[in-house]
Amino acid sequence: MKRLFTGSLLCLAFAAGSVNAAIEPTEKDAIAMAERGAAFMKAHGKEEMMKKITAKDPDFVQGSLYVDMRDIKTGIVLAHPINPSIVGKDLTDVPDANGKKYRREIIELAQKQGKGWVDYQYKNPTSGKIEPKTTYILRVKDVVLEAGIYKK
């Protein structure tokens, strides 16, 4: 009986950890999602990837973690699952809540290194509040895929 009880507690603890992980994605999750997007794009093309993002495909949108896409030369947003009103716009010089032009930093990092992390403040779609965010960026040909997580 003691083993059954202990086993049940372990299962509950594991399940609770899994639920928590799903609610709060990690840097590893962001990297994996961006890389999954890059692999899909290489296999199916940019247009198909844009359709997946726009359709909020569960491979590329999971709660507050999602992939968006921007043109590496112009900075124009090509696809965004949470805020489609910014698609087609160049927001490169629009700062975050603290005045940081993080989108310019994203483009420069993508052009120079091809991948990396950028920190800034952004509205969390889950909480509705401006929160610290870090985004993994990955260059794929002429676009930048971005997948970010909110810091706690």
Name each model feature, range by range:
Residues 2-152:
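N-terminal membrane-sensor/transducer module of prokaryotic signaling receptors
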